[in-house]
Each structure stands twice: as structure tokens, then as C-alpha cells.
Amino acid sequence: MGQNFSKKSGNDLVSRIVFTILILIVCRFGSFIPIPGIDSIALSSVAAQNQSGILGMFNMLSGGSLGRMSIFALAIMPYITASIIIQLMSVAYKPLENLKKEGEVGKRKVNQLSRYLTVLLASFQAYGVAISLESIVTNTGPVVILAGFFFRITTVITLVVGTMLLMWLGEQITQRGIGNGTSLIIFIGIISGVPSAIISMFELSRKGALSPLIAIAVCIGVVVLIAIIIFFERAQRKLLVQYPKRQVGNKIYGGEATHMPLKLNTSGVIPPIFASSILLFPATLANFSNSNSETMGMLTYYLGHGKPVYILLYVALIMFFSFFYTAIVFNSEETANNLRKYGAYIPGKRPGKNTSDYFDYILTRLTVIGGIYLSVICVIPELLMNKYVISLSLGGTSFLIVVNVVLDTMTQIQTYLFSSKYEGLMKKVKLKN
């Protein structure tokens, strides 16, 4: 009976993995379906000229969908942005914060708000894309075959539906598959661009534009970079938490000690994405509007990849968002109150404000190290891309996303296998009894 249970659990895991793979294949197929009214030849020339900047980054996150202007061109980014905005608002807006504390019902309401905001953001972005496409004219002709109201409305509807479909597919993976659906959709998009980036690098090496030694050094550097990311993403500070002893009759219960793990990089991959988006916005605006103003030209130049001003601002923004997002993810005061509620305490620290201040002290030190780690991981590839013209799909942000998603998915699979074995063991014990 125990063997049958174990076999059933194994089959369930396999079916979840197969389901996840099938959904991701659907996402890849959708990224090749173009929106109506686009001249693909003219569009490909525009995409080739905008491989850097925020367009290149979003094209990387969408798995090339933006460059092909497919139905998934906006990718799942409006949903992620909406979720982050709701998260930020829950800190500043008290009713929303109270809603999050209402358990499962409150969680469903917050998710519904995120969906409404996703539709709104996707609509604005889709309309902006439609207007921008209409203004682009290449040597082969305009990108839009027949500009006008009909093209704009069909583009908005198509792109919004594409984003909502991706959001729904991501939720299906989370519920019925394995891993976080949203993260896996971004992951598969980034991975899809890696082969072309490798081919491009070897082509540069073959033509003599890139030294073979440099190409080998880049490959070794990638392995080292992945190892560093794994080390820092797994690194954590464990705080000792003591529970009081309780006497029930003649027996004493409790009194055990446990550990509260605090991640070194609590903010995750959000700071580099936000920092890149802010810094590359002027260049994107100039590209879309075809602006020839001197001010816009200076901004575009100084905020170009690898420029000293860009690097300094990039590091400053990464550090800022590291602290900002860590404060949202980990609420020191709330955690300290929860410990006091259950009678737990940090040895040597009084429950309440003293414990909260201690959490803030530890988190500040961890966030400084985490912010420096994120800055180094993101800045070094930027400098290499600027010097050796390496594809953006090999950037620091993409490495962070890929490694984090792989680690999280592996952890979930291990947890699933462990829980299945535990359930099988408990079933055996019940049968024997």
C-alpha cells in the first residue's frame, strides 16, 4: 500500500512537470503570432537598431515577443508592475493594508485589484506601442501598413488579451504545475534568447571582432557569475528565537530554540529591473518620439550603457530600491509583535520595540551587502557589453532571474518530494497501528 502511495505521488509530480512544460510551449508559440497590420520586414530592422536600452531589456524579458511585435509583446510585465504597485500602496494606504490581513478572502480581493490594474496598465502601454509604431518609418517603408483608429483599437485589444492570457497561464502553472508560473514564463523567455546570444558571440570571434581568448574568458566568467549568484542567493543570517517553557500538570513543555532565517538579498531581482527602467526611459522616449532636441540627445548619450554617469546612477538606484523593497517585504515591527504574541523572544533583546530595532539593525547590514552584490552582478556585464558588444540577454539582470527561478523551482520540487515521502510514511504508521 505504501509503495502504491509513493508511486501515485511520483506520477503526480511527473504530471505537474509535464503540464508546466506544455504551458510554457504554448507561451513560446504565442510569441511568434504577430499583431495585425504590421510590416514584418520594416519591424525587424527597427528591432535590430534597438537591441540596447529598455526596449532590449523588455524584449529579453518577453522572449523576443516585443521585437517581433507578437500578441505577447507586453509579456507579463504589466501584471508584475501592477502587483508591485499594489504592494507599495498597501504600505501607504491603510484600508488596503487591512484588506491583506483578512486571510484568504482579503487575498482574493487584493489579487482582483491587481488584475484590474493590470488591464489598465496594459491598455495604456498597448496604446503607447500603437502610437509609437505608427510614427516609425524605415528605409523599406512604414512599420504600420494602414495607420489609424482601427489599427490602434485592434492593437490595444490584442496586446491586453495577450497579457491577460499570459497571466492566466502563469496562474495555471502555479496551481496545477510546478514552480511559480509568472517567474517561469519570464525564465523561458530569457532562455530562448541565449542560443542566439552565444551564436552572436562566436560569430564576432570568428570575424576577429572578438578575441578567442576573450570569448573563452566570457564563458568562464559566466560560470563564476552563476556560482556567485547561487552563493549569495542562498546566504542567510539565522537569528536565534527562544520559546518559553510551559508546565502542564507534572510535565514541562516548550522551551525549545529555533532559528529565523533572514536572506542576504531580501529584495530579490526587483531593484535592478526598476533601476534599469528609470535610467533607460529617456533613451526610449527619444527613440519612440524621434526627438532631435539637444537636451534629449545629451540625456541619451550620458545615460547610455557603460557610461560613467549611467553606472553611478545605476548603482545608486539599485541600493535605494534594495532598502525600499526590503522594508516592504520584511516588516520588522509586525514580526516583533508576532513573536511577542506567541511568547517567543530573541535572547538578550526585550520583546517589542527593542526586538524591532534589532531586526532593523540586522536588515540594514544585510541590505548593504545585498545591494553591493546586486550592483556588482549588474554592473560588470554592463561594462563587458559596452566594451565587447555582447548581447543584452547575457546581462546581470537576466542571470539573476534565471538562477533565482531555477533555485526556487528546484526547492519546490524537493519540498514536494519530501512531503510526499512524509505522507507515505505517516500512512504506513497508520496502517500498522
UniProtKB/Swiss-Prot annotation:
Species of origin reads: Rickettsia conorii (strain ATCC VR-613 / Malish 7)
Location (main, coarse) = membrane
- What's the protein name? Protein translocase subunit SecY
Q: Which Gene Ontology cellular-component terms appear in the entry?
A: plasma membrane
Q: Which HAMAP family does UniProt cross-reference here?
A: SecY
Q: How does it assemble?
A: Component of the Sec protein translocase complex. Heterotrimer consisting of SecY, SecE and SecG subunits. The heterotrimers can form oligomers, although 1 heterotrimer is thought to be able to translocate proteins. Interacts with the ribosome. Interacts with SecDF, and other proteins may be involved. Interacts with SecA.
Write down the membrane topology: Multi-pass membrane protein
Which Pfam family name is an example for this entry? SecY
Gene Ontology annotations of biological process type: intracellular protein transmembrane transport; protein targeting; protein transport by the Sec complex
Arranged from A to Z, the UniProt key words for this protein are: Cell inner membrane, Cell membrane, Membrane, Protein transport, Translocation, Transmembrane, Transmembrane helix, Transport
The family annotation for this protein states:
Belongs to the SecY/SEC61-alpha family.
Localization, per the record, is: Cell inner membrane
- Lineage, top-rank taxon, reads Bacteria
InterPro entries xref list: SecY, SecY/SEC61-alpha, SecY_CS, SecY_dom_sf
Q: What does this protein do?
A: The central subunit of the protein translocation channel SecYEG. Consists of two halves formed by TMs 1-5 and 6-10. These two domains form a lateral gate at the front which open onto the bilayer between TMs 2 and 7, and are clamped together by SecE at the back. The channel is closed by both a pore ring composed of hydrophobic SecY resides and a short helix (helix 2A) on the extracellular side of the membrane which forms a plug. The plug probably moves laterally to allow the channel to open. The ring and the pore may move independently.
Q: Which residues cross the membrane?
A: 17-37, 71-91, 117-137, 141-161, 184-204, 212-232, 268-288, 310-330, 366-386, 388-408
